[in-house]
Amino acid sequence: MEAEMLYSALALTFAIFMVYRILSNSQEKSSLIKLPPSPPGWLPVIGHVHLMKNLLHRTLYDFSQKLGPIFSLRFGTRLVVVVSSSSLVEECFTKYDIVLANRPQPSVDRRSLGFSTTSVIGAPYGDHWRNLRKLCDLEVFAPTRLASFLSIRLDERDRMISSLYKISSAGFAKVNLETKIVELTFNNIMRMVAGKRYYGEEAEDDEEAKRFRDLTKEALELTSASNPGEIFPILRWLGFNGLEKKLAVHARKTDEFMQGLLDEHRRGERQNTMVDHLLSLQESQPEYYTDEIITGLIVALIIAGTDASVVTTEWAMSLILNHPQVLEKARKELDTLVGHERMVDEHDLPKLRYLHCIVLETLRLFPSVPTLVPHEPSEDCKIGGYNVPKGTMILVNAWAIHRDPKVWDDPLSFKPDRFETMEVETHKLLPFGMGRRACPGAGLAQKFVGLALGSLIQCFEWERMSAEKIDLNEGSGITLPKAKTLEAMCKPRHIMERVLRQVSNV
């Protein structure tokens, strides 16, 4: 036992010494090229990791106020460059769009979270990624494909509205809006994917639904967890890989679940689902549309269609509850352009300009992925006059850009009206990224949010739980959830009573 402990101690000492030498050499090389400035406090082995706080985007914003719109950090052996200005973002994704089209490849198995070489989110830039992106644009997120699922989206919207009506038909009632939005969004996407409902009343097979909900919950927890082994590979060699084991187990369970869906649809009659459509493509090109590729596409679709939609809708409702004048203006627009004889439809969304302004302003203040998905240059380049070596991780702090007083008037205030008179420029408002690696599901997410938000405003009166404003503190994670679940009081609008009774079959 003593010999083993001595061996482990010697191995750890040697490993730390080697990492220190590597980092020292990299620091010496860095001094020979003009890297973006770094904050003080760099330490051997760990770099700047100890300076990172719980909300990464806010920590990076604080650094940018001292160091400027571009700066660099060391996360262990990894060089990270952070961009925090709209002008530099425009430079990155116009001049260097192809160079920056790569993604950093995780050293651990994150395929069940959408980051893998078979996923359009995480695949390296090249022919394979171009094929995946083309498939997404033409087959998965194509307007005609999404239009074929319109009846599903309307039905799930009606179910949510009916549920709220039954809760509040006697007068103002307390509702957990987060729960309702999660049920709406995940049922929407899973009916499109596989024709199944896994949340709320009338959910499919209880055991299967529970498996899916458990996988979703675990995925959320894993995306919020940090993995020191990715920053310090030596920890993986020494066995400190608890998160990696959890990721591997989650990936295996996700693969088994998705394979079960594929096999079930192979055995059954073809339906209008994304799984059936992809399986038909597999029949024509089996060498390319493997089960692994199809699973990667489905996972990407689930992620693209749920995360942004859930958090954006919840933030939007929180903001308008704190600004009743915005809620009233949106309701008047709906009453004028849609009326009271029917509920708002997706076809109404293009003409509901103020509703769209609310969505844009929500995405500005609370982008669902505040530092976007990281990029990695495939060759050395210069950004803002600084050298950025090949293989650097590049983070774009969209949260900081969206609150930049040089770009936005009164940037910390919720003012949807600002978008009524200004043209949206993608390098200034980029909640879904920019360039060729922008999120392919942005259009679907905005359809989800617009329809849900418009329906909630049109059909119900809303009030806060008390005179106190809704808490707008942010929670932790890759996405930007609220720290506190949104609860509110609602009751049916008298003028919409007849429509609500029809939808609720009462």
Swiss-Prot record:
It is found in: Membrane. GO terms for cellular component: membrane. This is (+)-piperitol/(+)-sesamin synthase CYP81Q2. Its main location: membrane. Expressed in seeds. It catalyses: (+)-piperitol + reduced [NADPH--hemoprotein reductase] + O2 = (+)-sesamin + oxidized [NADPH--hemoprotein reductase] + 2 H2O + H(+); (+)-pinoresinol + reduced [NADPH--hemoprotein reductase] + O2 = (+)-piperitol + oxidized [NADPH--hemoprotein reductase] + 2 H2O + H(+). Keywords: Heme, Iron, Membrane, Metal-binding, Monooxygenase, Oxidoreductase, Transmembrane, Transmembrane helix. Involved in the biosynthesis of (+)-sesamin, a furofuran class lignan. Functions in a dual catalytic mode. Catalyzes the synthesis of (+)-sesamin from (+)- pinoresinol by formation of two successive methylenedioxy bridges on (+)-pinoresinol and (+)-piperitol, respectively. It comes from Sesamum radiatum (Black benniseed).
